[in-house]
Amino acid sequence: GQNYTQKYNKLYDRTEFYNSYGNLIGYAKHNSLYNRLEYYDANGNLLKTEQYNSLYDRKDTKDKYGNQQGYEKRNDLYNRNEEYDSYGNMKYTKKWNDLYKRYEIFDSYGNMAGYYKWNELYERWDFIEQ
C-alpha cells in the first residue's frame, strides 16, 4: 500500500506531509489568532481546520468555508480516539499499540486501515497503509 510521512519543520513552524516519493503533498500549521490547526495543500491553499470544542469536549473539523465536516472524540472506555462524520457516523478509530509502539487506524467495521510508526532515524511519523 501507499506510505506517507509527516515531519515537523522547525524553520516554517509546521508539520509537513509527504507521499512515498518524498514529494510535499501538504502541511498543517497552528493559527494562534483563531486558536486552530489549519491544513493546506502543497500550493498553500486552505483545505480544512481543526479546533477544540470545549462544550462537547471534542475536536471539530471544518472545510475551508467553515462547514462542519466531522469531529474526533476520546473514548476512555475503549482507550481510543474516534473520528465521526458530520452526521455522527463513525469513520475510523485510532488506538496506541504498546507492544508494537505505533498508532493503529481501524475503519468503522474494525478492519485495520494502516498505522503510524515513529521513525527514530529520520525523526518523523511514517504511515503504512494496509
Question: Residue locations for each model-derived region?
Answer:
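Repetitive, compositionally biased segments used for assembly/scaffolding
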Residues: 1-130
